[in-house]
């Protein structure tokens, strides 16, 4: 039997079930097995590994994962795809499909039920564009014990995850992801290898979880508040952004100027020029003056 991710087999499956693509669910099926293999290769899935997939579609990536992993768990929100997955994944007894929205699911419960304690597990997925960021944040903030993520996403979002200070792509998303993970852009994927064809190109991004965050901060929540406030209006200075947008901090520009100067950061700089280390230093200094 041909792999699912060939143009003809995908077309046959879609026609057999009369499946219509829902734009609202970001359904674009990959029809290139070479790209799928690059994804699985970079996940470094071994015979004892587990994989979590989000949005398996008709099972193209799931199939490649099932050939290599000990266990694959796939979250699929669209009930119409369940009978299709029953057929396409029938040869693989190591796959469990869960008909739930991963954003609402108790992922820790699923993890403990489906995987062995201490098992090497990766999140491997062709993520729906419209929920890429919420999914990554949910799985990172809930501290799911996975080794990392190899995910396909909109190229523009991938560029933001990997961005360095001083670039137009660099922002609060870059800092949040790099705080938890090491980011690597594996490859750009042209829009032509999807059905239906999206309007943008994609990228495969690998995120390997750090043993501990890249910087030490006194208060994680406050650190991210400082970061978000610093990027509230990109063209404004740190001084203006922090004095107008940092909740729980005195509206005192003189105090803010003094703190910024003390930690060696020019108040006239913009947030996009600060490294993650500078943001950590700044938030650790600012929190000493936070209103209780």
From Swiss-Prot:
Protein name, UniProt field: Ribosomal RNA small subunit methyltransferase A
Pfam families cross-referenced by the UniProt entry: RrnaAD
Binding site for S-adenosyl-L-methionine: 28, 30, 55, 76, 101, 126
HAMAP family, sorted: 16SrRNA_methyltr_A
Superkingdom of the source species: Bacteria
Keywords for the protein's UniProt record, in alphabetical order: Cytoplasm, Methyltransferase, RNA-binding, rRNA processing, S-adenosyl-L-methionine, Transferase
InterPro entries, alphabetized: KsgA/Erm, rRNA_Ade_diMease-like_C, rRNA_Ade_Mease_Trfase_CS, rRNA_Ade_methylase_Trfase_N, rRNA_adenine_dimethylase, SAM-dependent_MTases_sf
Entry's family note: Belongs to the class I-like SAM-binding methyltransferase superfamily. rRNA adenine N(6)-methyltransferase family. RsmA subfamily.
PANTHER family: DIMETHYLADENOSINE TRANSFERASE (PTHR11727), DIMETHYLADENOSINE TRANSFERASE-RELATED (PTHR11727:SF7)
Purpose of the protein: Specifically dimethylates two adjacent adenosines (A1518 and A1519) in the loop of a conserved hairpin near the 3'-end of 16S rRNA in the 30S particle. May play a critical role in biogenesis of 30S subunits.
Catalysis performed (reactions): adenosine(1518)/adenosine(1519) in 16S rRNA + 4 S-adenosyl-L-methionine = N(6)-dimethyladenosine(1518)/N(6)-dimethyladenosine(1519) in 16S rRNA + 4 S-adenosyl-L-homocysteine + 4 H(+)
Listed Gene3D superfamilies: Ribosomal RNA adenine dimethylase-like, domain 2 (1.10.8.100), Vaccinia Virus protein VP39 (3.40.50.150)
Location within or outside the cell: Cytoplasm
GO molecular function, one term: 16S rRNA (adenine(1518)-N(6)/adenine(1519)-N(6))-dimethyltransferase activity
Keyword rRNA processing: yes
GO cellular component annotations of the record: cytosol
SUPFAM superfamilies with a match to the protein in the record: S-adenosyl-L-methionine-dependent methyltransferases (SSF53335)
Disulfide bonds: none
Location, primary (coarse class): cytoplasm
Lineage: Bacteria, Bacillati, Bacillota, Bacilli, Bacillales
Enzyme Commission number(s) of this protein: 2.1.1.182
First-level EC class: transferase
């Amino acid at each position: 039997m041909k792999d699912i991710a060939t143009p003809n087999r995908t077309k046959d499956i879609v026609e057999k079930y009369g499946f219509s693509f829902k734009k609202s669910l970001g359904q674009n099926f990959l029809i290139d097995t070479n790209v799928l293999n690059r994804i699985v290769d970079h996940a470094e899935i071994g015979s004892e590994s587990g994989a979590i997939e989000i949005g398996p579609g008709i099972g193209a990536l799931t199939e490649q994962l099932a050939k290599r992993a000990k266990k694959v768990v796939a979250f699929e929100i669209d009930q119409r795809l369940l009978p299709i997955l029953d057929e396409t994944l029938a040869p693989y007894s190591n796959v469990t499909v869960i008909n739930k929205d991963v954003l609402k699911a108790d992922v820790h419960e699923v993890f403990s039920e489906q995987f062995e304690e201490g098992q090497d597990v990766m999140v491997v997925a062709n993520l729906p564009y419209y929920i890429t960021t919420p999914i990554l944040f949910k799985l990172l903030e809930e501290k799911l014990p996975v080794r990392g993520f190899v995910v396909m996403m909109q190229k523009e979002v991938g560029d933001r995850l990997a961005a360095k200070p001083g670039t137009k792509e660099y922002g609060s998303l870059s800092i949040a992801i790099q705080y938890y993970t090491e980011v690597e852009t594996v490859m750009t994927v042209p829009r032509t290898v999807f059905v239906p064809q999206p309007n943008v190109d994609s990228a495969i991004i690998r995120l390997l979880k750090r043993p501990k965050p890249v910087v030490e901060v006194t208060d994680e929540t406050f650190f991210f508040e400082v970061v978000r406030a610093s990027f509230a209006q990109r063209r404004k200075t740190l001084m203006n952004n922090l004095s107008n947008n940092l909740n729980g901090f005195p509206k005192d520009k003189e105090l803010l100027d003094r703190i910024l100067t003390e930690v060696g950061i020019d108040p006239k700089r913009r947030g996009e020029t600060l490294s993650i280390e500078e943001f950590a230093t700044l938030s650790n200094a600012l929190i000493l003056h936070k209103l209780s």
